[in-house]
């Protein structure tokens, strides 16, 4: 019973966070030609926790490592960390996805 209660409360929290964050990132994804379903990567990466930080040092909703964040245009230093800025980090994520699409040739799996 305790596991069900935990799962229910976590699900409710994710729904609340999705209602807060998805309306911000959906237009950014669309403007950059990124499939709307990619927003769910944020759920997997950070549980939609804007202050998430992994033991390895990845941070923010999209869980960028410092060097990767800088590579895709985010300012990351001792004074500023734009990995926590939802709009800027989402634009950086779009750049990351576009680079991956260029390397792979498509967002779709083609055996």
Locate predicted features.
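Glycine-rich active-site/cofactor-binding loop and its immediate structural neighborhood
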Residues: 38, 62-63
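An acidic, Gly/Ser/Thr/Pro-rich helix-cap/linker signature
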Residues: 1-33
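Solvent-exposed, polar/charged alpha-helical surfaces in well-ordered, non-transmembrane soluble domains
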Residues: 16, 23, 27, 39, ...
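Short, functionally critical alpha-helical segments immediately adjacent to catalytic or ligand/cofactor-binding
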Residues: 34-51, 108-111
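Acidic-enriched, low-complexity/disordered segments with a strong bias for Aspartate over Glutamate
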Residues: 19, 36-37, 78-81
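Short, mixed-charge, low-aromatic patches
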Residues: 20-26, 46-54
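Substrate-binding clefts and substrate-entry loops adjacent to catalytic sites
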Residues: 2-12, 48-55, 63-109
